[in-house]
UniProtKB/Swiss-Prot annotation:
Protein topology in the membrane: Multi-pass membrane protein
Positions with biased composition (Polar residues): 11-23, 42-71, 387-399
Protein name: Membrane protein of ER body 1
Keyword Membrane part of the UniProt annotation: yes
Gene Ontology terms: cellular component: endoplasmic reticulum; endoplasmic reticulum membrane; ER body
Annotated spans, Disordered: 1-71, 127-149, 283-375, 387-406, 470-492
Phenotype of null mutants: No visible phenotype and no effect on pathogen sensitivity.
Keywords from the UniProt entry: Endoplasmic reticulum, Membrane, Transmembrane, Transmembrane helix
PANTHER family registered for this protein in UniProt: MEMBRANE PROTEIN OF ER BODY-LIKE PROTEIN (PTHR38937), MEMBRANE PROTEIN OF ER BODY-LIKE PROTEIN ISOFORM X1 (PTHR38937:SF2)
Amino acid sequence: MDPTMNPTPTPSSAGNSVCTDELTNLPPEDSPLDSEKDDSVDFSQEQGSESNEAIDTENGSRSVDKNQYSETEVVVRAKDLQTEPDSLDDDVEIVIKNQHKYYIYCPCCGEDITKTVKLVKISDPKHTKDHDKAVDSDTENGSKSKDKNTKVPSWFSDFIQPLFSSEDRGKKGVVDSELLGTYEDLGIIGEEPSIDVSNEKDRPSFPKWYLDVFAWLFLCIIIALSVLSTSPPPFIQPHLQLPSMPTLRMPSASVLLLLPTSAVLLLFIISMRSRFTPRYHKEKGEVVPKSTDSKSHDDQAANTDQDFDKKTDNKRNRLTPIYPSSLEKPSKQTVNKETQNHDKEAADPDQDVDKETENQKSHLTPIYPSPLEQPSKQIINKETQTEPMLPPNAQSEIPNSVEPRKGGNKVEILKSIVYGGLTESITSLCTVTSAAASGASTLNVLALGVANLSSGLLLTVHSLQELINEKPRKQTNTDDSPEEGEGEEDRYEEVLGRREYSRIHRVIAISSFVIFGLIPPLVYGFSFRKKMEKRQEYKVLAVYAVSLLCIVLLSIAKAYVSKKRDYVKTLFRYTTTATTASGFSQFVGYLVSQWLEKSGFYDDSPETQRV
């Protein structure tokens, strides 16, 4: 507690006495010998008796007659009015020395402070030469530091400094007790102000990946034109016979161009439709105007209550309790609504029974507990208050999104399998088909697929670790609908499941990644090993069949574990993505290999000896 004293100015005998806001005993003018000492205090004289105190009952303060205590006068150096704030520490010493002469009370609770303070004098530390030089330099320059404004005793920092915790001790002599009281009541001491940043609504904007798609298409068109352009065949001597190499029969370039262009147009249409369609369903949209109407009624009642609270606050001059929202205010709001309903019923007596019941339902208000109740009862009442405010449509959506399903472990296992295997299955299929279309051997295709899998494994482990370390985000309500309150959104629980089983999730996801990533290269390497015509085409078709089967199964599992079980939409999306990506990669690989062979940039054919 910070002790504060009532100001009682006293007259001076010589005219040069000190006038402060805390002391009631003021000493006479000092002698010239005492002026050489900096803020020194003489405590050698004895304390006087308390019999001659005169209590001022009207002002609630006590004044002490200066003439009655001539024996206990304290010698203090007289100072000008401009340097009065520098004598704060000496005043504190005088107050603590003569505690029986002052009326000390607590500014927060208003009770008297009856305990005495015992002080122990500690020897001052020895000043070094460097410190003396610094003091001399400061005095020569006429500057004073913050600690040199007053001569602080050695025991001041341990005992008295917590009582005066203001930052500017040399400038402010007394701590503002009113500010401390308000901060303690609000409970914000030592806390940084929190800033609630709400995200703006997503506005439709032109996606950036469209530019990448157009760039790839432009590059493919240039490559196709360069391949299809007529160029003179390379000169081959007639007596040389090059070894015949089996060529892979591929469809014409015009047919291959139709597949990626149609796929890109399809993806463009789907993305544009999903981009500009409303987020929420019609059921949620229908509840919004009702909630806004109820909100407007609550705002009107809240404004009337604020005017009433301001009038009462001016009378009492006390801090009013801060309610979290307008729904948690006392029952004055219910009284106003009930009077409005009675007036409407008196004006329109011919209303139907259905309308009356609807008005009663819309104006139902919960019963709020009194401030004298126990906190446990208040918590129960608040929980019962929030239950009737939920919209009727929210209950139908809770079982699919929030409530745990039966067999939650199976769902989490499926989520982990889908997370690790679905994307890698598509990536591995594209890698194998592009390598096969470029004319690589079976061994090279197998090695390339396994190498791609090893590099993707590190990226998958890194993404899993980032997902585990990601903290839950606060979901704020950006719309006007109050039925969707604020909550925490954990992305890990949505993707994989509960955080308690994170190790199991990682093991299953990594194993799924490895298994589904190895299927395309292994099928290509170990299928149709006998020499036959069109063996490479059969290998590619086998890879397509097995990979599409895996993608179909994983997409069905993804639709099963999602909140909205759209099997057809999910299946169509992933199968279309897989076929489009693999066809596009195969087309690009074939064009690049043919262009490099015809241009002569790279030739790996064995050298033949001339005859």
